């Protein structure tokens, strides 16, 4: 199954978003357009009636082959706020459990006139495979595929950073934890690099670091958390993904917390105004202590709010191209 989701598949002939599979190969201008569009949609969430008619008459189908309450719920809410009809497929009770292929399942859904699929799958490359096999008028959004990519999470993290820190050109950002199994880490590294962040630091035990990070993403790698966190502006903590680990990668969760967990004491190594992020779900006392997760520097709940706006931006842009902001302005004027 292919795992490389480069520009020709994701963009149409005019350079507008067609599918959203990975941040790899997407230009800085497009990522900025997504962030700007999401900024516009944040205002919609503050309205008494939290809806705009940009996707009225369209059907968005959430096809989650891997559980994720947060991602599925925010995609549902994003589609509903755009006035789309929403179908969420419970895969555990679907025909795939009876031996039906992924392609057959999607063909049946297409027969129901779905305009867009939001797909989450445990196999890397699944979203790319689906995008290659759907009808030309159907858009595919990757809700997370294996270790490969989680592009909307990457973009909501970028929106969080931009709203709290301004531009990216003078920031130091640390990504801490289970890098090896994290599609979020990969999407964040790609987004930060594309948006011009000059100092991307990756902090993890050697057993949880993929080979070749420095060359592929232009990051600095640290196995000592105290050294890596010194004077950073942003700290992104990652969950230990025990369900994806083979034995022997870690001595214990307690040992991991001792060496890499974000405590109040360790956070003081970062800049005084550093922000703390986490894609969730949080393992308190494993990668982060409660005093930090709930503290004044935490923007974890903001990430959830911004996630709805980012997903609204991606859904609307994939359906209508990069004129979403103009359409939204026209709706406001009427």
UniProtKB/Swiss-Prot annotation:
Pfam families: OTCace, OTCace_N. Catalyzes the condensation of carbamoyl phosphate and aspartate to form carbamoyl aspartate and inorganic phosphate, the committed step in the de novo pyrimidine nucleotide biosynthesis pathway. HAMAP family: Asp_carb_tr. Pathway: Pyrimidine metabolism; UMP biosynthesis via de novo pathway; (S)-dihydroorotate from bicarbonate: step 2/3. GO terms for biological process: 'de novo' pyrimidine nucleobase biosynthetic process; 'de novo' UMP biosynthetic process; amino acid metabolic process. It comes from the Bacteria. Heterododecamer (2C3:3R2) of six catalytic PyrB chains organized as two trimers (C3), and six regulatory PyrI chains organized as three dimers (R2). The gene is pyrB. Belongs to the aspartate/ornithine carbamoyltransferase superfamily. ATCase family. It catalyses: carbamoyl phosphate + L-aspartate = N-carbamoyl-L-aspartate + phosphate + H(+). InterPro entries: Asp/Orn_carbamoyltranf_P-bd, Asp/Orn_carbamoylTrfase, Asp/Orn_carbamoylTrfase_sf, Asp_carbamoyltransf, Asp_carbamoyltransf_Asp/Orn-bd. PROSITE patterns: CARBAMOYLTRANSFERASE. It comes from Pseudomonas aeruginosa (strain LESB58). L-aspartate binds at residues 98, 183, 239. GO terms for cellular component: cytosol. This is Aspartate carbamoyltransferase catalytic subunit. Carbamoyl phosphate binds at residues 70-71, 120, 150, 153, 280-281. The keyword S-adenosyl-L-methionine does not apply. Its EC number is 2.1.3.2. Keywords: Pyrimidine biosynthesis, Transferase. One of its GO terms (molecular function) is aspartate carbamoyltransferase activity. SUPFAM superfamilies: Aspartate/ornithine carbamoyltransferase (SSF53671).
């Amino acid at each position: 199954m292919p795992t490389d989701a480069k520009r020709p598949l994701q963009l149409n002939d005019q350079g507008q978003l067609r599918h959203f599979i990975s941040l790899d190969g997407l230009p800085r201008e497009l990522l900025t357009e997504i962030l700007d569009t999401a900024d516009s949609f944040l205002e919609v969430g503050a309205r008494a009636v939290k809806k705009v008619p940009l996707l009225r008459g369209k059907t968005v189908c959430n096809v989650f082959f891997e559980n994720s309450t947060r991602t599925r719920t925010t995609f549902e809410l994003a589609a509903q706020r755009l006035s789309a009809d929403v179908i969420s497929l419970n895969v555990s009770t679907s025909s795939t459990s009876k031996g039906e292929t992924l392609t057959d399942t999607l063909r049946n859904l297409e027969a129901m006139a779905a305009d867009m699929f939001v797909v989450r799958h445990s196999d890397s490359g699944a979203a790319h495979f689906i995008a290659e096999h759907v009808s030309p008028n159907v858009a595919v959004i990757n809700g997370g595929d294996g270790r490969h990519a989680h592009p909307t999470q990457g973009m909501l993290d970028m929106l969080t950073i931009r709203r709290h820190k301004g531009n990216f050109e003078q920031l130091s950002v640390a990504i801490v934890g289970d890098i090896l199994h994290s599609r979020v880490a990969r999407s964040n590294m790609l987004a930060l690099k594309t948006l011009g962040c000059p100092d991307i630091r990756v902090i993890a035990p050697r057993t949880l670091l993929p080979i070749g990070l420095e060359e592929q993403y232009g990051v600095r790698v640290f196995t000592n958390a105290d050294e890596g966190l010194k004077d950073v502006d942003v700290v992104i903590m990652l969950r230990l993904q025990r369900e994806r680990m083979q034995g022997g990668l870690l001595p214990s969760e307690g040992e991991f917390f001792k060496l890499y967990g974000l405590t109040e004491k360790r956070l003081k190594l970062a800049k005084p105004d550093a922000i703390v992020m986490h894609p969730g779900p949080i393992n308190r006392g494993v990668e982060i202590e409660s005093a930090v997760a709930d503290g004044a520097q935490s923007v974890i709940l903001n990430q959830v709010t911004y996630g709805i706006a980012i997903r609204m931006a991606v859904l609307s842009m994939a359906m209508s191209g990069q004129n979403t902001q103009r359409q939204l302005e026209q709706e406001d004027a009427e």
